């Protein structure tokens, strides 16, 4: 999932990233491109789900392209009900892309938490979708 091993102190909870104004709130983010060089993540201004004027956006040059956006380590120490909330949007009414959320555990194993599959959603309104992923005592809930 990551292009190497991330070292250093993890972020503590609560952890938030809003990309406010098209800028980073937290310094440790990485991108791994898995397609053509024309496809990329970028920080965008004036486009946001929460009204703060920014987001991280992915623009694909090909339907086969993919990329990974990852954060630094986040400590879940002491968290009983870990929750991840994120918003996605496709500007295509007939979108077929996927947003797949993974975590990497301290033992380096990976766990898929959630998939937002636009090919299975009605995207005719092209609105923002907010997804909440909650991990409760080994029960995983994904609500879109």
Predicted stretch roles:
Residues 1-12:
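N-terminal pre-domain segments of enzymes
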Residues 10-63:
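Extracellular glycan-recognition surfaces and repeat-rich motifs
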Residues 35, 105-109:
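Solvent-exposed strand-loop boundary residues in beta-sheet-rich modules
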Residues 56-79, 83, 129-132:
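Short beta-strands within extracellular/lumenal beta-sheet-rich domains
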Residues 76-80, 89-97:
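Extended, low-complexity, turn-rich repeat/linker tracts enriched in Gly/Pro/Ser/Thr and Asp/Glu
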Residues 83, 142-144:
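Short, conserved beta-strand segments of beta-strand-rich sandwich/propeller modules, principally
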Residues 100-102:
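Beta-strand signatures of extracellular beta-sandwich domains
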Residues 109-141:
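Extracellular carbohydrate recognition and processing domains
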């Amino acid at each position: 999932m990551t292009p190497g091993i991330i070292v250093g102190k993890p972020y503590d909870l609560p952890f938030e990233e809003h990309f406010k104004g098209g800028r980073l709130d937290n310094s440790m983010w990485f991108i791994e491109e898995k397609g053509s060089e024309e496809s990329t993540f970028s920080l965008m201004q004036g486009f946001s789900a929460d009204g703060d004027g920014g987001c991280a956006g992915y623009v694909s040059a090909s339907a086969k392209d993919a990329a990974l956006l990852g954060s630094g380590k986040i400590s879940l120490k002491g968290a009983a009900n870990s929750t991840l909330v994120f918003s996605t949007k496709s500007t295509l009414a007939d979108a077929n892309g996927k947003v797949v959320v993974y975590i990497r555990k301290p033992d380096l194993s990976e766990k898929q938490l959630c998939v937002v599959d636009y090919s299975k959603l009605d995207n005719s309104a092209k609105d923002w979708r907010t997804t909440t992923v909650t991990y409760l005592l080994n029960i995983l809930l994904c609500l879109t």
